[in-house]
Amino acid sequence: MIEQNETARPGDGLDWSAVLDTLPFNSDGLLPAIAQQHDSNEVLMLAWMNRQALEETLQTGRVCYYSRSRGTLWRKGESSGQVQHLHELRLDCDGDTLLLRVDQQGPACHTGRRSCFYNVLQGNRVVVSEPPQVDPQTLYGP
């Protein structure tokens, strides 16, 4: 359905509930969700959302993901205090990836770094590009 927007003019749109019903969640009921800082365009992290996480995020304005490792909803910042507030939701041209433009409070990464993308390929080495902003033990406790 989202493909209908490929030839649409700016300002044209589709009904959200109809689009939501046609999103191509994978066999586990998930879509990839990229979090990006809304005012700097910094890419913060990649996580997954099921329909319930997506609906909760839109309802509350606080980003909620689905944790594949725990098999449950994961409300970003619930234990660390490093919450993400949704500024804008975008869908890619196929509707199979979400872009969450957020206001990130503190580090986004569980390592205490601002972004999960701190490993940079330089030649034949993967180099750490930034130090943690916060000690992970401070974020999550012992």
Curated annotation (Swiss-Prot):
Where do the annotations place Mg(2+) binding?
A: D92, D94, D96
Query: Cofactor note from UniProt?
Result: Binds 1 Mg(2+) ion per subunit. Binds 1 zinc ion per subunit.
Q: Which residues bind Zn(2+)?
A: C93, C109, C116
Q: Could you tell me the keywords of this UniProt record? A: Amino-acid biosynthesis, Cytoplasm, Histidine biosynthesis, Hydrolase, Magnesium, Metal-binding, Zinc
Q: Where are the transmembrane segments?
A: none
Cross-referenced Gene3D superfamilies: 4.10.80.70, Phosphoribosyl-AMP cyclohydrolase
Single GO biological process annotation from the record: L-histidine biosynthetic process
Q: What cofactor does this one take?
A: Mg(2+); Zn(2+)
Where in or outside the cell? Cytoplasm
Q: What is this protein called?
A: Phosphoribosyl-AMP cyclohydrolase
Q: What organism does this protein naturally occur in?
A: Halorhodospira halophila (strain DSM 244 / SL1) (Ectothiorhodospira halophila (strain DSM 244 / SL1))
> What gene is it encoded by?
hisI
